[in-house]
Amino acid sequence: MSDWSLDQARKTYSIPHWADGYFDVNAAGHVVVTPTADGPAVSLPEVVDAARAAGAKLPLLVRFPDILGQRLGKLQAAFAQAQSEWDYAGGYTAVYPIKVNQHRGVAGTLASHHGEGFGLEAGSKPELMAVLALSRPGGLIVCNGYKDREYIRLALIGRKLGLQTFIVIEKPSELTLVLEEARALDVKPGLGVRMRLASLGAGKWQNSGGDKAKFGLSPRQVLDLWKTLRDTEYADSLNLLHFHMGSQISNVRDIANGMREATRYFVELSRLGAKISHVDVGGGLGIDYEGTRSRSYCSINYGLHSYASNIVQPLASACEEHGLTPPRIVTECGRAMTAHHAVLIANVSEVEQAPEGRVPDAHDDEPAAIRHLREIHDELDVRPAVELFQEAQHFHAEGLSAYALGQIDLTHRARIDDLFYAIAHGVRARLSFDEKSHRPVLDELNERLVDKYFVNFSVFESIPDVWAIDQVFPIVPIERLNEAPQRRGIIADMTCDSDGMVKTYVENESLDSSLPLHRLNAGESYRIGFFLVGAYQEILGDIHNLFGDTDAVEVVVDRDGYRIAQQRRGDTTDVMLDYVGYQLDTLRATYAERIAAAHLSPERAQELSAALEAGLTGYTYLSDEPLG
């Protein structure tokens, strides 16, 4: 491609549309990261090289904690602007639900941004124990999820220790436990109630909101809870109203509709006498993983300002209309805070090129399928391309059937494939996406005629949402972007599972079934970046084939450059085997017995013993040495 340029690289991989200013391409063709507005752009390949020099191996998760602070600041600024525009005096708190990424480096970095404008959310006892320590004195803690007596007691202890804990009632039975424990500890509880909205935000996570939601009270249950609480000494403790419209809401109209309904609950509960001081709108703020700026499930058609305005405006109008004190607005936008800050870097271990196809020499005893395919190939420049491909598909299938029935041998079977792929390449060269009738065939050919890039990582461990819910993540080679990619490829991982593949790729502000990639150069590592993986992926990842956590580094960027602030070694084989119940001493003893029984020379026995020990204590992933 003679017209290739850095701008063409940016466009091909849709970088300006999903990167939100944090990632770009420099003149050397490297992906660069700019975590802070006034900081330098740092070469991602150089960061990876420095991490490897310090002992890290690929696959490698690279975290930029400065981006976390930037994301939080942008969210707070958007609500400050919206509240100013709507003359709203209630204030705003950005709560981080640590389920999104509980790692200390993530939750701790966000929690270090002290102030009334930040809080934490827990959905389980272990998470609660973490946030009780992470929270600033007097900090806001929202306690969600299913609760037993111990969970409630711990939350109330937090209240007694000066933290602003709110226990959100999500099941009617929880209120009785809260009242009993509050009296036992002699502490006034901070209570919230989660409502089930009828409004439903469309998307992959839509059942986290609406009538089918796992959590929350119905209108009748909300009324019954208030009637029960009203007759106790804690009637003025119901201070937080919580609801959830969904996660990764793509369409801003869904947010507006949900807020319209939720505001009615705020007005009605206030009219009944509840002292609602906080309205927690939950999560929902999406990320444009695709860069398509659309209502697609992995995209969004709005920005931060629009999101904030659609939350502030209904509450501002309701408070003015009904003479109510504006409540503090709380959001739980963990995805928006964390997604951008982490990038997974993995090396290509091998490439299986798509069949090129060739025309074999003719033979007198050729089966009918081969003769027909040869005739089609001879007419590639004469007859309509789509018609030729359809005929080729028919005779290719006929040949496969004949082989399965034992009517032709392996040599003929191979020649059938050779001819079919030669035809496929010839047909693709004649088709154009500008012709509507060509598009279905082009789509099929682009899926067939692609290389397989086997990448040293596990889909199930590092990007599990790709497998679980067909989530889309931007994927970009982190170097050589000043060169035109010569191939199209799909990415397969190292697991022994056919689901360990990426099937959808971000390209040219759209989605495709393959990705432009480069030919590998002998002696060079070809490294690919998986972007926007900072939310949920680490926590949801599993250990399929016993591939464990990857190595990880935290990179801090300032005006003088960057430094690797923290390095964490990934899981080793012995750790994974111990996790699934293997006794390491027994394994070592068994290896030793088998070496002894093999009657090897002392030198060879020592060599094999050392190799087995290295395998047992080594990284669970493949070597990251360059190919060739």
Swiss-Prot record:
GO biological process, one term: spermidine biosynthetic process
Modification type N6-(pyridoxal phosphate)lysine: residues: K99
Cofactor(s) for this UniProt protein: Mg(2+); pyridoxal 5'-phosphate
Residue positions binding substrate: V279, D280, V281, G282, G283, G284, L285, G286, I287, D288, Y289
Organism: Xanthomonas axonopodis pv. citri (strain 306)
EC numbers on record: 4.1.1.19
Listed NCBIfam families: PRK05354.1, speA
UniProt catalytic activity: L-arginine + H(+) = agmatine + CO2
Protein's name in the database: Biosynthetic arginine decarboxylase
Listed SUPFAM superfamilies: Alanine racemase C-terminal domain-like, PLP-binding barrel
Native organism taxonomy: Bacteria, Pseudomonadati, Pseudomonadota, Gammaproteobacteria, Lysobacterales
GO molecular function: arginine decarboxylase activity; metal ion binding
UniProt KW keywords: Decarboxylase, Lyase, Magnesium, Metal-binding, Polyamine biosynthesis, Pyridoxal phosphate, Spermidine biosynthesis
Record-stated family: Belongs to the Orn/Lys/Arg decarboxylase class-II family. SpeA subfamily.
Role description: Catalyzes the biosynthesis of agmatine from arginine.
Top EC class of this enzyme: lyase
PANTHER family per the UniProt record, alphabetical: ARGININE DECARBOXYLASE (PTHR43295), BIOSYNTHETIC ARGININE DECARBOXYLASE (PTHR43295:SF9)
